Amino acid sequence: MKRTLSLLAICTGAILSAPSYAACDLGDLEAEGKISLLSNSYPVLKHFSDKMKECEASKLEIKNKLVGGSAVQEQARIVLSSRRGNSPYDVIQVSAQSYHEFLLKEQIQPITDLVEKYWDEYNLADIPPSIWDLARHGGEIYALPIQLNMQEFFYRQDLFDQHNLEVPHTYQEVVTTGQALQKAGIDYPLSQAMGKGWNLATEFTNIYLSLGGQYFDEDGKPLFDGEKGVEAANILKSLLPLMSPNALSLSNDLVMVNFQQDKAAMGNVWATRASEMDNDQVSKVVGKVNYSMAPTANKNTTIPATSIFWDGYVFPHRLNSDRELVFKIMMESMSKENMKEGAELAFLSRQSANQVEGEQYRYLGALAEMIERGAKPFPSEGYYGLAHTEIGNKLPDALRGRTSIEVALNEAAEGYYKEARAQGYID
């Protein structure tokens, strides 16, 4: 099977990868000191981190810290907000969400001069302008895009075939399909990350965007507690009978394990988890999981209930090391050859890396299709993270029936507005 994936109008995401077929070449730069990276730990980013370490030399140590879940962004906030000396990390991996937050707070530095200097040497034109635009602000480039990531629909092809089921295209169809699987003896057919906090707020965002919802008005005042917000939350609530009793504590890692251990039949899952479905060292379902577009919120919309998410590498405003050396190391880890090697793990930013063959790349087709169908980017307002936090913390009680959805969303909106004013985002 061959996938030739156009980046089309990917006005939202990417991946600058990291393996290397040749030794790391730092040219005539003085390779000494210690370079450190703070990054998330999921497979594709660990892959890049490992390739960075190939640049170590007798006088150059590369010490990377990989942490799970949203902890990387929490640690980055602490590091970047500190006014005491230089950052302990030379490179920090950011998400689409945290990038805009750090940019507005002027905590990261532009790297336009280095991008231009090494443009030809590393064939950076291979990354489309729409991808570079993600990292551009006021004419300056502030990040090296790493990858495009989206949640897509994972499903057990063998179980769907066995029970003559069609892949659901709306969340109502997900519920109907789940009920059919339950009748067939599968108690908890659905698994997706709906744990309190970041994960649940992300699922809410996916459905809210599919409904055409806008988070804020032009002045930054909240809109997510309106009719579409209530509908999005009710759709989430309708999924709980299909999920295990610990549904509201499920993380992305736990969802991945559920699929690997034959405890899930379907769910909206991050595309970067797809390669682990076929990892025969840990998975019991090798070759059995297939991929489709994320379902839409309802039959009246064609927008997939997902968010185009991107990750990138940024340099702290107060950088301790030689910034050109740090940049060169990142370029070596993101070479054309390295990105091609990493295509199995994620959707890469270089156009040349997206012509791939093999069943291990079968998850990529759904990503391209969702982009064509109008999938929305993750909200980019610098203050969006405040709303995300409030929703993730307030909504679980409503989904458990301890309060109404309307009350929970109103409280989240009030909490967001108060904090956004306190931090000076809005008047």
Task: Kindly label every feature range from the protein language model.
Residues 54-127, 162-169, 258, 265-266, ...:
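Extracytoplasmic "Venus flytrap"/periplasmic binding protein-like
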Residues 202-203, 234-321:
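Extracytoplasmic/periplasmic substrate-binding proteins
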Residues 272-286, 297-393, 421-427:
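C-terminal lobe and pocket-closing loops
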Residues 112-127, 189, 194-195, 211-231, ...:
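Short, solvent-exposed loop/beta-turn-alpha elements that line the ligand-binding surface or hinge
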Residues 23-25, 96-150, 203, 288-294:
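Hinge/lid segment of periplasmic solute-binding proteins
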Residues 79-82, 87-90, 120-158, 188, ...:
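A structural signal for short loop-to-beta-strand junctions that line the ligand-binding cleft
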Residues 137-146, 151, 175-222, 264:
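Extracytoplasmic/periplasmic solute-binding protein
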Residues 177-184, 219-248:
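Glycine-centered hinge/linker elements that transmit conformational signals in sensory
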